[in-house]
Amino acid sequence: MAMLEARPYRPFKSSEEYLEAMREDLAEWLSTLYPELSINADNFMDRLDTGVALCKHANYVRQAAVDYLARRQARNKSMTRSMTSGLAGPILAMGNVHYLPAAKSGTFFARDNVSNFITWCRKSLKIIECLLFETDDLIMRKNEKHVILCLLEVARRGAKFGMLAPMLVQMERQIDREIAADIKANGAGCSENGTQTDALETGNSSAATMTTITTTTVETDLYDDSDDSETEDDGDQNPVLMYGPQPQIITNDLKSLDEMVRDLVEKCTCPSQFPMVRVSEGKYRIGDTKVLIFVRILRSHVMVRVGGGWDTLSHYLDKHDPCRCRAQHRSSVAARLIPRQSPNHNPSNGIELHKAQVIFERSPPAARRVFNSPNCNGGPGTGSSCGTGVVGVAVPPTLQNGHSLSPNSGKYRSRSPTPQRKFLNQQANGGGIASATGSSQTVTTDTSSGQLLGSPSLARRSMSPSPRRLIDMRKKQSSLDSYSSGPKSLPGYSCSMEEANGGSGVGSAAGGVSSGSAGSGVAGEQGGANKFENISDNGSEISDEGYRSLGVIQSGAQKRESLHSQASIEDAESNARLDQTSSDSQISPSDEPAEKATTDILEEEDLNGQDREEDQEDYSVCDGPQSLPAILSGAHKLSDKFEQSGVFITDDEITVDIAKTEDQSVANTMGNPTPNLSKIPRSPLAQRRRRSIDNSTCGGAGGSLQDLSSRSGLPAPAFSRKQPVYRSVRTRNSTGATTTPVAPPRSRQATQLPMVRDVTNTWSGRTTGAPKRRPPCTADTFVAPTNGTGPAGSFERNGKGRSSQILYDSNGRRVRSGAPGCTSSLTTSPVKNHASSPLAQQLLEAASSAKNDAQILEKMKSLLSRYAAGNQTKAGVGATATAANKINSNGKKTPVYEDFTTAWVHSNGNLERSESCSPPAKARSKRSSAASSCESNNSNAGAGSGAAAGSASVVSPRRERGMSKIPAPVRHHTELY
């Protein structure tokens, strides 16, 4: 059963039984104290969730403490000798608990009542926090266990003041007196025998940490009442009140305690039965130790005193009986991280951790031991599964091209992979083709060499292991190799294997394929392909040692989006979103079924046949768990391939030979229609910076990430982040063949940081692939305002100069101001940008060096007149108002604009409307201003009817004659504001 619902951490089927026993006991106790409650085990929480009964009981305990102190004072007992007297002090100091008797269930008044009770428990009774509960635990039924444990503790404290106690508390006090009597009789030397709270319970007492902590002999905390009420009240006339007036209810068919214990112990299936020796009535010695446990019957439950609390004997045996412990609480041998690769995964991006799967290797459950393979000697047509406790999983036959005949063979995955993977030789004379369904690669490994050669297309070089990491991996591998006892089984997407004896059959690894210590081949018979296909170890509830991180077992009806979280699809969705910004992956994972992806990969392998012939040593890496040294062992092969491709990798940098890379990519585009994935490992830091750039694209490379494709000369689709789901190689031929790599910039060989002139992102943060481009504005649909110098060019919406972006220079430093290739945005704050034109720079320098306003005005006048004269001589007589607001490529302003600025400065801002250079212009829309800005940056504006557009873009003062005479400063033109 899939672990979708919230479950307690304890993995055993009997783990809730002790709570049921406690609930029954507390319900009977409260029903005796408060008959008007009509409480029983079924409506236990419903009767208490208003908090009224709890607050009443708190006041009842306070009254009992008052009576207790009065009795002690009447007998002239010392108030300091008793621990219980010390407990009574804080209770009396607090006063009564206030509550609203008419509170309804679920209301805030009920919450207030419950909160007052919890505060009273904490401050008056000094109950430790681990035994308290929260308001929601009772109101919302979030944690019934804590409510029960807290009420048991309250009952213990009340029993010290002479109140009626539940049966469990009475039995606790009886056991404590029995232990104290034994110690008095035998002396302190006997204490070495101890009780049930010894080392056996130190690691497992979390299953039954229900009450306070006791020592191995006499309780030495708040319950050490050797001279307290239970001895002093022995002479009272009603001692029964201490231990409850109710006799024990017999619901066990009059079986004695010993018979019930014997019945439970007899369920042991060990070769030699788990010993439980009766010492005296209710006292047993457990196992082969000297540990004594105290057993009592509580209605139909056999209870064991554990660590200051109670557990059921069946649950206790589940934890300590070796056969039950192994059957239901399987110990973890080792853990392994399996990166789950999607078919269109670009391996140079590193390991995709968002879909990685953690596999805890442990012994198989009892359910799996039933299905032992009857034949350990497989014929030549099939593999063999031999070894104790191994499931024979039937294997579907495969065709020669690698297509599996079983459509569901890739869906079911074993959760008990081997700690030891044995790859076998593929015999050349066998002629068999081994196909791993659910994975896309084939493994060919020489076991004698022990090296796993990885192809460059799947090697993960972006995560360089440290020497310490390599040492740890070697230690772990040696420890795993030494673990040879017990069955082994491959993971779900395991590598396919063939028999080492040259069998001619075809083996396919499907689901949980098991191999014994001999490790020879693939298990099962081909006849019953679906017989054991969906076997998983969910028959035993999984413990809390991290197994829940495996997620849901894949089945035909349920498919989890992600296997990395415990049970939440929200985690999967959020991680899918986080994948867009993670530094490990830039290609979105494919969510297609495994069998479809396998088919497509096999088609790609058919298309790439000539590559396989040309390079015989192109071994592939399986999708299964890989140890890092095994991958790194093929480093010399990888470096040879990288150097052939023009990529030279050292410890400090990655150098790309552009000429070689271009030749290689052109040859690939011409000879092979399938675009190869990148073989250049990329630094996560560079990717993070690259994605932090606010986006804008310009034409080229089909609108893909030009800063990546132009640098390495690789086809653009290999780098697009929002790549469509990989369907088939043949459908991608057109885009792959038509994409031409853009010539890279010259001085970009040893860096991966995006340059200012290479940034090709979009405004909204997405990358625009070739199919998503907007239709360009051509000459017949858009008339650009020109200055009459060049031929008409097409309008480019996503030019480099039209976005606000965070840019980095070749040293990795952030470029603050607009560079020559990229101006500032129209919408960015002018305060945050440095001036980018020479005139503005000189004006700022002049203003900073001047002492007062007069000097500033003088310097500005001289600068402006100098620039005006220079521009007039350059522009000549033919300069008209057409290019009034144009900025030339050298950043200087045109004469019309200079006249306006000069007049404004000379007149100290008191510029008359008649002196304006143009009639009032309408406010430009965003589209027109963006168009003119883009055209001003691309200095290829053609001749045309640009006079109207040019004159319309000169900004005049915005008020009428009778209004303010000071014009609004125009930051687009001056760039000073």
UniProtKB/Swiss-Prot annotation:
Function as written in the Swiss-Prot or TrEMBL entry: Essential for development and viability. Required for ovary development and oogenesis, and is essential for the development of the indirect flight muscles. May act as a negative regulator of the Notch signaling pathway in certain tissues, such as the muscle precursors and ovaries. May function as a linker protein between the actin and microtubule cytoskeletons.
Low complexity bias: start-end ranges: 928-953
Might you name a Gene Ontology BP term for this protein? protein localization to microtubule plus-end
Question: Where do the GAR domain residues begin and end?
Answer: 252-324
Protein encoded by which gene: pigs
Which cysteine pairs are covalently linked by disulfides here? none
Residues of the region (Disordered) are 218-245, 397-543, 557-624, 666-685, 693-803, 910-977
Give the protein name, as stated in the record.
GAS2-like protein pickled eggs
Q: What's in the GO CC field?
A: cell cortex; cytoplasm; cytoskeleton
Q: What else is known?
A: Named 'Picked eggs' based upon the mutant ovary phenotype.
In which tissues has expression of this protein been reported? Expressed in the ovary and the ring canals of the germline cells. In larvae, expressed in the notal region of the wing disk.
